[in-house]
Design a protein with these regions (language model features):
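Detector for outer-membrane/organellar transmembrane beta-barrel domains
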Residues: 182-286, 292
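Bacterial N-terminal signal peptides
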Residues: 1-3
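Sequence/structural signature of outer-membrane beta-barrel proteins
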Residues: 38-47, 79-87, 119-125, 135-141, ...
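Active-site pre-Tyr helix/loop in NAD(P)-dependent dehydrogenases
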Residues: 63, 119, 258
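Residues that define the transmembrane beta-barrel architecture of outer-membrane proteins
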Residues: 54-59, 95-100, 146-150, 183-187, ...
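Surface-exposed coil loops of outer-membrane beta-barrel proteins
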Residues: 40-57, 84-101, 109-192, 197-202, ...
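Hydrophobic transmembrane alpha-helix bundles
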Residues: 104, 110-121, 150-158, 198-210, ...
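Beta-barrel outer-membrane channel/assembly domains of diderm bacteria
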Residues: 6-114, 154-164, 218, 227, ...
């Protein structure tokens, strides 16, 4: 009996020694970002964000510092240059015109993350960084939708293919704090279903409501088809639009993509429409105007370097565009160079 007992104890000790020790990932600190510059052939541009300067021009330098611990981390995303200045325009006291994103997050578990701070919007297909966009110029929907939010959000992974995000935020693009004491908070939500996203925000000083769909499908290994549709209403006017983004990859280094966008401005001012009897925007249109744009972009990649030649044509419902004189059409050619790190 004694020998049997000793054997059992030895076996238990062996099992304890051989039991795998759960490893905890070490915290990581990373610096990434990009630099971009471009040449634009036309002195005049459509009324969209970024890539709208004449001749040889610079985009921005983007430096993103991030720290990821076992349960928590932060992101500090800084931008320098014209593209960055256009993206961060809600710095009311001028103390943070360089801050594109600045937030801290905490993972309660593998499925639930809380984020507090300033973060880029979850609406729309396009983003501020030129690295993540296929087209170098931007759409009207992106240009007049929100760029960023300051608030708190909860990201919930319901299953591997279904996710939910809920947020309470300041007035849209108010980077530092809620500067308008009369403004209500903005509430946001996102439902993710198998890689397709339905986005929603509502509230703020102008009682804005925006519903947005962003998605895409891999038609084949080389052919991707992206889709974005949005509807925005507010006391200051409305707009809506839809865009498709077919992209074909010919090789590891070259791809070709198209953006076709149809955009309607109803008294919002993006296309020079009237609001409450007064002219708003750059042109002098009616209370409702339309614009369609066709953008063809090539993308050549070599390591971290990206070269993008791009042709864009805008066609308006009336002469609210400007090309030396009022016109209803505008075309331009852009060559962009981007380096990511």
């Amino acid at each position: 009996l004694s020998s049997l007992s000793t054997y059992a104890q030895d076996e238990t000790l062996e099992a304890a020694v051989e039991a795998p020790i759960e490893e905890v990932a070490a915290p990581t600190f990373a610096i990434s970002g990009s630099v971009d510059s471009y040449y634009r052939s036309n002195e005049y541009s459509p009324y969209t964000a970024f890539a709208n300067l004449n001749g040889f021009a610079i985009g921005m330098a983007n430096v993103v510092m991030s720290y990821e611990g076992e349960k928590s981390g932060f992101v500090a995303d800084l931008v320098y240059g014209p593209r960055g200045n256009d993206a961060v325009f809600g710095s009311t006291v001028g103390s943070s015109p360089l801050v594109n994103q600045l937030y801290v997050y905490y993972n309660l578990n593998d499925s639930f993350t809380l984020t507090l701070g300033n973060f880029n919007t979850f609406l729309g297909y396009e983003v501020i960084s030129p690295v993540a966009n296929f087209n170098y110029s931007t759409s009207y929907m992106f240009s007049y939708g929100p760029f960023s939010h300051t608030g708190v959000k909860a990201d919930i992974a319901i299953t591997e293919d279904v996710s939910l995000m809920l947020a309470v935020m300041n007035e849209t693009d108010a980077t530092e704090f809620q500067d308008n004491t009369d403004a209500d908070n903005v509430f946001g939500a996102q439902l993710g279903l198998f890689g397709q996203y339905i986005n929603f925000i509502s509230g703020g000083f102008a009682n804005q409501t925006q519903i947005d769909f962003t998605g895409g499908f891999n038609i084949s290994d080389n052919f991707f088809f992206g889709v974005n549709a949005t509807s925005f209403t507010s006391d200051d006017g409305d707009f809506s639009g839809v865009a498709v983004y077919p992209q074909y990859t010919f090789s590891d280094s070259f791809a070709l993509g198209v953006r076709f966008e149809s955009f309607t401005d109803d008294s919002f001012g993006a296309l020079g429409t009237y609001v409450n009897g007064g002219a708003v925007g750059i042109g002098s249109g009616s209370s409702k105007e339309d614009n369609t744009s066709f953008t063809l972009t090539g993308s050549y990649t070599s390591g971290n370097f990206i070269f993008k030649p791009e042709f864009r044509m805008d066609k308006a419902s009336s002469k609210f565009l400007f090309d030396g004189s009022d016109t209803d059409s505008l075309s331009s050619f852009i060559i962009a160079a981007i380096y990511s790190f």
